[in-house]
């Protein structure tokens, strides 16, 4: 008698809010029970199938690929893939079902089965035992490929149900098979499954009723239990089906697009031709021999691995962007490639940098290289639509991102499902929103008014812990495109994205890596938009024709500005953590900037590399090298490994790793905190280094640094790509501050700083800011010349909250035909409605036509009255009404309410006497305060950051009328005074002043909320980004 069984109907947690176990948990349990195979049949999706495939391989248990579907007004079926034709048919069916309805839903019709779907086996899951007519239709449609699924879950009438189903199968002459309708790997997940069901139906568990399964039997049961429930023939039948389902994802064969290659060329010869053209463009006087050899080596490897079409595809996208004058730049590991530089994809000159091509691609890697290209964020859509036009929507789609449950969302969903009232849900999420450890934050709960011993609270937290990390839904990748020669839905299902004119495949980037599909990342970067806008402004107003390539390099005033941490608004080094590092590192060259970009990251910090590097840079510590070979690797960073490439090179040079093995080490570094896998490298490194004469202490030190890189260390090539934009933005801020500030505001939202902070910084740099004025303002902020000085910034109509761009464009067109005589003339010629005119009046934009705000609002109201019932009739002259001029504080309040900023006095100027009475010093006063002295400071909160580099420390930026103050809030104080920390707009800090050279900050000891002093003024703060 055959003792085995194959489960043919099983949901993973990629049946969102239904399946209560991961694929790995399911396969591990199935292997433990002695199953012969396991089908993963998530509902109308293959989103989790690659993970299931990897889980199956990890336990050496066959995976059967399938999907549960429900026909509209019809039966529930389970479709199982027999071979590659069946896989393609299933992908096409899911695509059709998902594309014909909105995101997150599907629709399958009986007509979808009018044509045969070869290679699919069909299980029918009847809801009643007398569905004879339904069975006849299914038999006629699927014939010999149809089975009746018998599902027994220890209900009161299992035996009667079994007999009736077998009788139905016999009557219809359909073979019957045992199946479990599995929703979880173990019975212990029942509470989570019930909770997820309640979440899905938007009801509390207590009211879910028959929506819940009656017991916990929908788990992977032991063979002994199954033999008690089912006749052996039904269990044996499961094995017959399993033996027929032989398809493996490894059989998929992806083909690159071919239309980019002219008929007279092969892909290889065409790539070489384009590269040679690029060499002539990049190096008009000829490239160095080492660069030409690097290019030849790369082209040889690209041809050997068959990736020519990938490079041609990326080149084509970049070519289109450059022709449309869209700024773009490749980054990431692709910047290690000399071929990418020659093709114009990246901007890191291999003649000036040490490249590690193996970081980008190597013979040992089992997937294509990954090229990321940033485009202007405002024009990226043009590039995306070009790709769709070029390849068609059947051959191009965006990659999915699997959105997973984090603590805050999981707590809210679980607490709501368990019936907690909204105020308690909010308080609980506030207490535990950043909870990541297995142990609940008991003290936080007590502070929030909760009893940690409460059984209900314990249940909420237990279920939350199980739910964290579960997939919640698929969302759209920011710009990862999959492009293929064959229709994509022969490889993976495609569905609608939430955004119009977008389609996404059901796999994410990790899935693509696993099965070897090409992905091109077409990403958006706000700083590229700002730089392009700045170039446009300089061309229009300053008659300068600049580009990224023509910005003067190695400019001393620019580096001096950077070393002072005068970097508000620039790229990458604008955060408080970066600003605090700049006066310590004091960059003097481009390579210093590369290091600056990379060093303020969790990897170098947690690997203990930052302080040794700074000490060596400041000649406080001697440079030492374990060997001459490693000196070559580490010399450029003073003997301290700061980059991923250096760690890989150390493994190659000191421990005899091959380049491909070094790349596997990099991957293990990136994933060890989530998945482990570094320990084998520890032994291998130690053995290899010992063999080559390195001490055990050095091997242990390197391994600890490698673990630090598991917390996000930068590749050098990526840091160099970003440093190019860092330098460009800094040069523009230093030499063309008005155009740069203007471009930043016009490109907002982007970066760390609000328009208000950018304008306040511009004023501190003695730039003239002119108010919004319908007589001069365009939609965007603009420049107005001042003889012999930096131009003034004219605030644009975009600054007015709620004002429409189309109204601004109407004003521009009307003004081009002649100046406005008064408010009525403006309203009539620009076609403005009452709402638009009121917004202009409140924002002070009618000052030049009507006087102050009160008078402007009065005139707008009068114009509307004339345009109302009495339009066209003679109007009586109304005497002038004496309206009071707004006070300074009234103007200040209305400025912030309508514009988010003010050109009047800073709010703290008006409060300075009150703050002095509270013993608060200004940021200017602090310049004279000695290190270690106790001080009190108050300011508007413009930023709160809790970076991963900081071990729970929160950095707060306070702004007053003279500048900014950096505040450090240690974790214990942040926990004790959390409400004040996160809720204050005007914050007083009592603490200890610290200064070391140009590095200054306040260590907080006590926080006080002074927000009521603002009388309702609201200031924007960038929090926890």
From Swiss-Prot:
Q: Which UniProt keywords apply?
A: Cytoplasm, DNA damage, DNA repair, DNA replication, DNA-directed DNA polymerase, Nucleotidyltransferase, Transferase
Gene Ontology cellular component terms for the protein in this record: cytoplasm
Q: Which GO terms describe its molecular function?
A: 3'-5' exonuclease activity; DNA-directed DNA polymerase activity; nucleic acid binding
Q: Does the UniProt entry include the keyword RNA-binding? A: no
Supply one GO BP term. DNA replication
Tagged with keyword Transferase = yes
Subcellular location per UniProt equals: Cytoplasm
Highest taxon of the source? Answer: Bacteria
Q: Cross-referenced SUPFAM superfamilies, in alphabetical order? A: PHP domain-like
* UniProt catalytic activity: DNA(n) + a 2'-deoxyribonucleoside 5'-triphosphate = DNA(n+1) + diphosphate
Chief location category? cytoplasm
Write the Enzyme Commission number(s) for this entry.
2.7.7.7
Matching entries from InterPro entries are given as: DNA_pol3_alpha_NTPase_dom, DNA_pol3_finger, DnaE2, DnaE2/DnaE/PolC, DNAPol_HHH, NA-bd_OB_tRNA, PHP_dom, Pol/His_phosphatase_N
Q: What does this protein do?
A: DNA polymerase involved in damage-induced mutagenesis and translesion synthesis (TLS). It is not the major replicative DNA polymerase.
Q: Which family does it belong to?
A: Belongs to the DNA polymerase type-C family. DnaE2 subfamily.
Q: PANTHER family this protein is in? A: DNA POLYMERASE III SUBUNIT ALPHA, ERROR-PRONE DNA POLYMERASE
Protein's name according to its UniProt entry: Error-prone DNA polymerase
UniProt source species = Pseudomonas fluorescens (strain Pf0-1)
């Amino acid at each position: 008698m055959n003792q085995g069984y194959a489960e043919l109907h099983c949901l993973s947690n990629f049946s969102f809010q239904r399946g209560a176990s991961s694929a790995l948990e399911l396969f591990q349990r199935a292997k433990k029970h002695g199953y012969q195979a396991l089908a993963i049949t998530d509902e109308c999706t293959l989103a989790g199938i690659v993970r299931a495939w990897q889980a199956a391989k990890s336990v050496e248990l066959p995976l059967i690929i399938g999907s549960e579907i429900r026909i509209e007004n019809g039966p529930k079926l389970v479709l199982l893939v027999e071979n590659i034709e069946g896989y393609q048919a299933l992908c096409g069916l899911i695509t059709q079902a998902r594309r014909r309805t909105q995101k997150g839903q599907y629709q399958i019709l009986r007509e979808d089965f009018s044509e045969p779907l070869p290679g699919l086996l069909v299980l029918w899951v009847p809801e009643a035992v007398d569905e004879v007519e339904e069975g006849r239709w299914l038999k006629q449609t699927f014939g010999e490929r149809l089975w009746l699924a018998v599902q027994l879950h220890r209900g009161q009438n299992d035996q009667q149900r079994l007999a009736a189903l077998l009788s139905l199968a016999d009557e219809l002459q359909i073979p019957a098979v045992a199946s479990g309708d599995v929703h979880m790997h173990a019975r212990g997940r029942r509470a989570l499954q019930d909770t997820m069901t309640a979440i899905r139906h938007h009801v509390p568990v207590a009211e879910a009723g028959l929506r819940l399964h009656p017991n916990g039997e929908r788990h992977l049961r032991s063979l002994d239990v199954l033999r008690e429930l089912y006749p052996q023939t039904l269990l044996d039948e499961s094995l017959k089906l399993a033996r027929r389902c032989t398809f493996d994802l490894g059989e998929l064969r992806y083909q690159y697009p071919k239309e980019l290659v002219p008929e007279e060329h092969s892909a290889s010869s065409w790539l070489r031709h384009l590269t040679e053209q690029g060499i002539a463009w990049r190096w008009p006087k000829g490239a160095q021999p080492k660069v030409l050899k690097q290019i030849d080596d790369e082209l040889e490897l690209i041809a050997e691995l068959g990736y020519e079409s990938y490079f041609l595809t990326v080149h084509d996208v970049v070519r289109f962007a450059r022709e449309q004058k869209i700024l773009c730049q490749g980054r990431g590991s692709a910047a290690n490639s000399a071929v990418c530089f020659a093709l114009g994809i990246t901007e890191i000159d291999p003649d000036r940098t040490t490249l590690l091509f193996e970081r980008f691609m190597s013979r040992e890697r089992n997937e294509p290289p990954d090229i990321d290209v940033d485009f202007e964020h405002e024009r990226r859509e043009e590039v995306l639509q070009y790709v769709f036009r070029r390849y068609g929507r059947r051959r191009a789609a965006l990659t999915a991102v699997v959105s997973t449950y984090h603590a805050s969302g999981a707590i809210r969903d679980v607490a709501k499902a368990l019936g907690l009232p909204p105020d308690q849900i909010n308080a609980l999420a506030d207490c535990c929103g950043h909870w990541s450890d297995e142990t609940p934050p008991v003290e936080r709960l007590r502070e929030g008014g909760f009893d940690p011993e409460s059984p209900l609270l314990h249940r909420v937290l237990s279920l939350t812990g199980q739910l964290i990390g579960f997939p919640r839904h698929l969302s759209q990748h920011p710009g990862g495109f999959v492009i293929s020669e064959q229709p994509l839905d022969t490889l993976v299902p495609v569905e609608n994205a939430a955004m119009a004119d977008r389609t996404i495949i059901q796999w994410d980037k990790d899935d693509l890596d696993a099965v070897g599909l090409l992905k091109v990342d077409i990403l958006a970067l706000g700083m590229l938009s700002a730089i392009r806008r700045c170039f446009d402004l300089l061309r229009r107003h300053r008659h300068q024709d600049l580009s990224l390539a023509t910005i003067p390099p190695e400019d001393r005033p620019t580096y001096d500005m950077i070393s002072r941490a005068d970097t508000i608004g620039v790229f990458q080094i604008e955060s408080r953590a970066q600003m605090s590092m700049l006066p310590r590192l004091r960059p003097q060259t481009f390579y210093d900037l590369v290091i600056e970009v990379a060093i303020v990251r969790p990897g170098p910090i947690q690997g203990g590399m930052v302080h040794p590097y700074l000490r060596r840079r400041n000649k406080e510590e001697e440079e030492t090298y374990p060997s001459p070979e490693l000196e070559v690797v580490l010399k450029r960073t003073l003997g301290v490994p700061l980059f991923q490439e250096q760690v890989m090179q150390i493994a190659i040079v000191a421990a005899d790793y091959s380049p491909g093995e070094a790349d596997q080490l990099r991957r293990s570094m990136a994933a060890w905190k989530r998945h482990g896998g570094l320990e084998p490298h520890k032994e291998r490194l130690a053995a290899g280094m010992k063999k080559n004469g390195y001490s055990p202490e050095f091997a242990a030190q390197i391994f600890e640094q490698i673990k630090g890189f598991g917390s996000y260390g930068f590749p050098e090539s990526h840091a160099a790509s970003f440093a190019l934009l860092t330098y460009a933005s800094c040069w523009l801020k230093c030499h063309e501050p008005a155009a740069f500030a203007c471009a930043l505001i016009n490109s907002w939202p982007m970066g760390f700083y609000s328009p208000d902070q950018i304008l306040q910084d511009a004023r501190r740099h003695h730039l003239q800011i002119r108010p919004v004025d319908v007589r001069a303002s365009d939609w965007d902020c603009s420049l107005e010349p001042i003889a012999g000085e930096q131009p003034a910034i004219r605030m644009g109509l975009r600054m007015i909250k709620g004002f429409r761009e189309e109204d601004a464009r109407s004003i521009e067109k009307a003004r081009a035909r002649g100046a406005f005589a008064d408010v009525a003339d403006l309203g009539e010629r620009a076609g403005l409605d009452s709402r638009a005119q009121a917004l202009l009046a409140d924002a002070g934009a009618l000052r030049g036509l009507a006087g102050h705000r009160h008078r402007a609002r009065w005139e707008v109201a009068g114009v509307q009255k004339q345009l109302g019932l009495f339009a066209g009739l003679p109007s009586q002259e109304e005497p002038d009404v004496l309206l009071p001029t707004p006070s300074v504080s009234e103007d200040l309040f209305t400025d912030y309410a309508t514009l988010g900023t003010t050109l009047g006095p800073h709010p703290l100027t008006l409060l300075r006497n009150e703050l002095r009475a509270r013993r608060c010093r200004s940021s200017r006063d602090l310049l004279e305060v000695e290190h270690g002295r106790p001080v009190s400071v108050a300011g508007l909160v413009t930023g709160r950051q809790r970076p991963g580099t900081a071990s729970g420390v929160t950095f707060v930026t306070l702004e007053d009328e003279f500048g900014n103050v950096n505040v450090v809030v240690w974790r214990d104080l942040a926990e004790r005074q959390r409400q004040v920390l996160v809720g204050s707009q005007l914050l007083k800090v009592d603490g200890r002043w610290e200064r070391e050279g140009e590095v200054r900050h306040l260590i907080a000891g006590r926080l006080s909320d002074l927000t009521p002093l603002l009388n309702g003024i609201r200031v924007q703060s960038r929090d926890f980004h």
